[in-house]
Amino acid sequence: MAFFRAYAAIVVRPVLAMYLLYGVAFEAHQQNSSVLFDATGRPRKLLIRDFGDGRSFAPLFQQRGHRIEPFTREGILPTTFDDDISLVRSFVIDACFVCHLHEVALCLDEHYLFAHTTPWHILREEIESAFDALRPRMLSDAFWLDERKAFLEQPWPTRSVLRMHLERYRDYRVEHELPNPVADLA
């Protein structure tokens, strides 16, 4: 479990930092994430590639003194939002937590017997730790509390990919909710 704790921390901390501090969501699923290991096999760094499908919340980015111009082109759905951060949050949860860390946790749970702590307990602890570490740098305590609740207590939104493909991406907001595997584990 020490390995999964280190792995989860390496993935969760930078992904949540970029989202909570700047409103930037990277598509940090397994295909786009490379974890660098040291000589002893411990996870040390996260590299994220494929920035073609990230999302951003312009007001939070601007509050940090930066400016972002939305990329617009006919046939390309927007990736920068001004009025609703939930579209950015759901992107983080879907890519990083549902399609990456939850999959690793499921695999570990299937192949190993855990006496006391499950992978989901560890994932929750690492999410809590990341939120706690970022709290002093947050611009709004209310925002921090709302986001913490969304990641730790509320159902997790995930993209309905098959439906989006069948509908030719006419609506990028096609989502459904999954039970949050880290809720009720505190």
Task: Identify the role of each PLM range.
Residues 24-89:
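Catalytic activation segment of kinase domains across protein kinase-like and atypical kinase folds
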Residues 15-18, 35-48, 57-62, 68, ...:
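Generic local-structure boundary detector
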Residues 111-186:
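Long, compositionally biased intrinsically disordered regions
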Residues 21, 73, 171-174:
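Intrinsically disordered, low-complexity regions enriched in small/polar residues
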Residues 1-11, 57-62, 70-131, 135:
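ATP-dependent phospho-/nucleotidyl transfer catalytic cores
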Residues 1-35, 90:
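Conserved kinase catalytic-core segment
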